[in-house]
Amino acid sequence: MNLNDVQVRRATSDDFNDVMNVERLAFGEDGEAVLVEDLLADQTAEPYVSLLACYQGEAIGHILFSKASLEGSNPSPSVYILAPLAVKPEYQKQGLGGLLIREGHRILKEMGVEMVFVL
């Protein structure tokens, strides 16, 4: 796989099943998929940035950045949390995770986000 052939785009509600499939295959269990489902349903985490990586029409990676806040900060800086990052096993260790992180950071920077924490 060549990273230049990978399309990274914002995930939509139509991509829900593909996102869940990537999460389950990447982690080998439902835990991360349930986390993603819960975060996508959490209105306090909006606006979130959910990106899907596709190769030859197949969803192969997903990353989620959720809005967060820092208690005690007034005013609170614009903060997001990166969790989770998932890549199907057969596409791991080829730079796809880094590609998703870079694209997510680019979008967050355009949004004026000041900090990103990784869980």
Regions from the PLM with identified roles:
Residues 69-82, 92:
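A conserved beta-turn-beta hairpin within the catalytic core of GNAT-like acetyltransferases
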Residues 77, 96, 113-114:
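Short coil/turn connectors at secondary-structure junctions
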Residues 82, 87, 93-106:
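Conserved acetyl-CoA-binding loop-helix of GNAT-fold acetyltransferases
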